């Protein structure tokens, strides 16, 4: 499924870029939220692996029930989450970090248009 590939590529970008941007993000966060605790690189990457697996499981279930309202609703819900994920953390973080934040390239170039397409697309009629 296309959305799973988008999530996989996006989370891979985040996982690879996080170690390099973590110090800058921590320094920036200290100005506003001094008590914030950032995950270690390993914690962050493991969270991405678990999140990717969970999304894959939900998408596999949704694909098997795509003609049912609950499968289509699950797909629309995930697309909404990924659309919000572009708007809320990635774009503002990239601006605050001077132009790049982990995941912003795939968020804007892949997740944004794909999420909008899924949300606009109509459910297939039941057979």
Residue ranges and their predicted role:
Residues 8-12, 80-89:
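Aromatic-anchored segments of alpha-helical transmembrane domains
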Residues 62-66, 87-96:
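Juxtamembrane "helix-exit" motif on the non-cytosolic side of transmembrane helices
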Residues 35-53:
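A loop-to-helix transmembrane entry motif
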Residues 93-109:
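Non-cytosolic membrane-interface motifs at loop->transmembrane helix junctions
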Residues 23-38:
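Perimembrane loop-to-helix junctions flanking transmembrane segments
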């Amino acid at each position: 499924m296309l959305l799973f590939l988008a999530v996989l590529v996006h989370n891979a970008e985040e996982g690879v870029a996080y170690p390099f941007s973590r110090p800058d993000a921590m320094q920036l966060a200290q100005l506003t939220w001094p008590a914030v605790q950032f995950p270690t690189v390993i914690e962050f990457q493991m969270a991405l692996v678990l999140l990717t697996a969970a999304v894959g499981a939900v998408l596999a279930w949704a694909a098997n029930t795509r003609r049912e309202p609950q499968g289509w609703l699950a797909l629309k819900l995930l697309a909404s989450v990924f659309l919000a994920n572009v708007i809320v953390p990635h774009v503002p973080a990239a601006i605050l970090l001077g132009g790049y934040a982990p995941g912003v390239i795939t968020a804007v170039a892949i997740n944004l248009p794909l999420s909008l397409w899924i949300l606009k697309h109509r459910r297939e009629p039941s057979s």
